[in-house]
Amino acid sequence: MLVGYIFLTIAICSESIGAAMLKVSDGFKKWKPSALVVIAYSLAFYMLSLTLNHIPLSLSYATWSGVGTVLTAVIGVKWFKEELNAKGLIGILLLISGVVLLNWQ
């Protein structure tokens, strides 16, 4: 099971990097960040496919999408100076709570 969570962590990080590079690529006008988008998302989906050999789909996908959303929001705030209001913070806390509850066994 631990190896599944390692694969899932790599998938989440890769997906978040890919999302950040989507913004940097300026609509795929810049080739280097565009290439990183393709590489990061390819790695993310490959790692997610490996995760599914160890963790059920319902748990894997919910964790991947929830934690990926939170991480992408953090990247947006930290590196792209995007603002997050109170509703956004509450949403992030709810996502984190949901992921924790799903993984609590």
UniProtKB/Swiss-Prot annotation:
Residues that span the membrane, as ranges: 2-22, 35-55, 57-77, 84-104
Family under the similarity heading: Belongs to the drug/metabolite transporter (DMT) superfamily. Small multidrug resistance (SMR) (TC 2.A.7.1) family. EbrA/EbrB subfamily.
Top-rank lineage group of the source organism: Bacteria
Assigned keywords, A-Z: Cell membrane, Membrane, Transmembrane, Transmembrane helix, Transport
Topology within the bilayer: Multi-pass membrane protein
Identification of the protein by name: Multidrug resistance protein EbrA
Main location: membrane
Location within or outside the cell: Cell membrane
GO cellular component: plasma membrane
Source species taxonomy: Bacteria, Bacillati, Bacillota, Bacilli, Bacillales
Subunit-level organization: The efflux pump is composed of EbrA and EbrB.
GO molecular function: transmembrane transporter activity
Function: Part of a multidrug efflux pump. Confers resistance to cationic lipophilic dyes such as ethidium bromide, acriflavine, pyronine Y and safranin O. The efflux is probably coupled to an influx of protons.
